[in-house]
Swiss-Prot record:
Source organism (scientific name): Conus geographus (Geography cone)
Stretches of the chain forming a coiled coil according to its record: none
Cysteine disulfide links: 2-14, 9-19, 13-27
Protein name: Mu-conotoxin GS
One example GO MF annotation: sodium channel inhibitor activity
Keyword Ubl conjugation: no
Annotated function: Mu-conotoxins block voltage-gated sodium channels (Nav). No effect was observed upon injections into mice and goldfish (25 ug).
InterPro entries: Conotoxin_TVIIAGS (IPR012629)
4-carboxyglutamate: residues carrying this PTM: 32
Domain-related comment: The presence of a 'disulfide through disulfide knot' structurally defines this protein as a knottin. The cysteine framework is VI/VII (C-C-CC-C-C).
Length: 34
């Protein structure tokens, strides 16, 4: 289960990253607020 709001998170978002709001393809650091 990926954290974040995107439904098309790339696999690396499942490894401590989250998907950026408005751009589910873009990973951002888990410390950033989405």
């Amino acid at each position: 289960a990926c954290s974040g709001r995107g439904s098309r998170c790339p696999p690396q978002c499942c490894m401590g990253l989250r998907c950026g709001r408005g751009n589910p393809q873009k990973c951002i650091g888990a410390h950033e607020d989405v």
